[in-house]
Amino acid sequence: MTTIKHLAIIMDGNARWADQHNLTKSEGHKAGADKIRELLPEFINLNIPYITLYTFSSENWQRSSSEVNFLIKLLSLYLKNELDSLHENGVKIKVIGRLNLLRSSLQKQINNAIELTQNNNKIKLCIAFSYGSRQEIVDACTKIIANGKKQVSENDIQHALYDPEMPDVDLLIRSGGVYRISNFLLWQAAYAELYFSQKYWPDFNKDDIHEAINDYSKRKRTFGKR
């Protein structure tokens, strides 16, 4: 099986899954969070060292206040309920995005999770929350300018991103039958292979992950070369 160093996933379709099952959007998002718990051991078994999950975009702030508040609460509950298990399983946690927009108590909770797991090396789980890739690049450039740089290189931008250690994305999976990348890791996914699934995220299972990876393994990556 072809080695994947960085798998990124746009976990789309929670609300439509809920509609399909006559459930509330909140129940759909809860099912989506439960799916992360279910699939994480498989990511570890597959020896994929870096996983990035798109959980809440910068554009999602425009949704109803009730949905936004629930998604924020869901992140807090996930960290509260899963942190010990993640730590015991050697998972290193990173959260990227404009986290300054979150309440201070959640920022503290995120920082505590990052600090607790900082020396773990089994797998790095990066949660993209309040995240937009254009915003990340703007923030990186602003940081570079503030440091007095006049000539900017790709290396400068890479080191000013939310996670400078993040490797380029090898495979980007999007569930939910939508064919776009929605302002997600535009810099890091410049040469990523894209895989789109019709399944809604709560219906995803390890066989779907294997199917995506198998499809990826059949592709020839040229990176612009012949």
UniProtKB/Swiss-Prot annotation:
The active site is at D12, N60 (proton acceptor). This is Isoprenyl transferase. GO terms for molecular function: ditrans,polycis-polyprenyl diphosphate synthase [(2E,6E)-farnesyl diphosphate specific] activity; magnesium ion binding. InterPro entries: UPP_synth-like (IPR001441), UPP_synth-like_CS (IPR018520), UPP_synth-like_sf (IPR036424). One of its GO terms (biological process) is polyprenol biosynthetic process. The keyword Transferase applies. It comes from the Bacteria. Substrate binds at residues 13-17, 25, 29, 57-59, 61, 63, 174, 180-182. Homodimer. The gene is uppS. Disulfide bonds: none annotated. The lineage of its organism: Bacteria, Pseudomonadati, Pseudomonadota, Alphaproteobacteria, Rickettsiales. Keywords: Magnesium, Metal-binding, Transferase. Pfam families: Prenyltransf (PF01255). NCBIfam families: uppS (TIGR00055). Mg(2+) binds at D12, E193. PROSITE patterns: UPP_SYNTHASE (PS01066). Its EC number is 2.5.1.-. Binds 2 magnesium ions per subunit. Its cofactor is Mg(2+). Belongs to the UPP synthase family. It comes from Rickettsia typhi (strain ATCC VR-144 / Wilmington).
